[in-house]
């Protein structure tokens, strides 16, 4: 499978593109949507470099309309519009461009209080989900999960280098009386 030309094997925990990764992400987003519709805790935090896949964006809009709280940390291109009433009012997008060129892709799904953490190589872009060999794997160790949650919290709290995506598509600098920089 590593070449992309061989017969797919059965994988227990890994999700690979171009075969299963899109479906995995869509099912995780859909599960959060169902939790929200049924009044259960539902939240998505995703950190990546780019978000421009129409199918993923549509799924995020649907999840937002159902009440899922969605925080996206997207360093580069983001084709999603956040904060639009009736469409994406539960979605917040921030971009952090600091000292380091980060390439981490981290995904958190609240899952009704049974949080699931994933890391991988793919951004939410058609070329990553459909045309490249990419991987997603779960983080199951509770100590690592705690560390990852801490990292995400720091990223979401950054007020020094973060810019917030507005509903009209432009970014504004995050402001706060406390200055926290994620890249320190």
Task: Kindly give the residue locations of the regions a language model identified.
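HKD (HxKxxxxD) catalytic microenvironment of the phospholipase D
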Residues: 1, 5-8, 96-167
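Active-site cores of enzymes that catalyze phosphoryl transfer or operate on phosphate-rich substrates
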Residues: 1-28
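A glycine-rich phosphate-binding loop feature that marks nucleotide/adenosyl-phosphate handling sites
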Residues: 13-21, 47-53, 77-80, 166-173
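Conserved structured core elements
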Residues: 19-27, 42, 50-58, 71, ...
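Primarily the HKD phosphodiesterase
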Residues: 27-92
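Hydrophobic pocket-lining residues within nucleotide cofactor-binding pockets
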Residues: 51, 124, 182
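Conserved small/polar residues in nucleotide/adenosyl-binding loops
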Residues: 178-184
């Amino acid at each position: 499978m590593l070449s992309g030309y061989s017969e797919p094997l059965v994988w227990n925990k890994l999700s690979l593109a171009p075969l299963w990764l899109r479906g995995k992400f869509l099912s995780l987003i859909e599960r959060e949507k169902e939790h929200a519709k049924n009044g259960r805790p539902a939240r998505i935090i995703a950190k990546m470099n780019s978000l421009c896949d129409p199918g993923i964006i549509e799924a995020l809009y649907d999840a937002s309309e159902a009440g899922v709280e969605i925080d996206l940390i997207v360093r580069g291109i983001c084709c999603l519009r956040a904060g639009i009433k009736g469409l994406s009012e539960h979605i917040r997008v921030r971009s952090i461009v600091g000292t380091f060129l980060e390439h981490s892709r981290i995904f958190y799904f609240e899952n009704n209080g049974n949080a699931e953490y994933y890391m991988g190589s793919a951004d939410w872009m058609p070329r990553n989900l459909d045309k490249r060999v990419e991987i997603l794997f779960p983080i199951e160790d509770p100590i690592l999960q705690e560390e990852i949650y801490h990292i995400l919290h720091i990223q979401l709290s950054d007020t020094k280098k973060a810019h917030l995506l507005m509903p009209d598509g432009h970014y504004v600098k995050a402001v706060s009386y406390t200055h926290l920089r994620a890249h320190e």
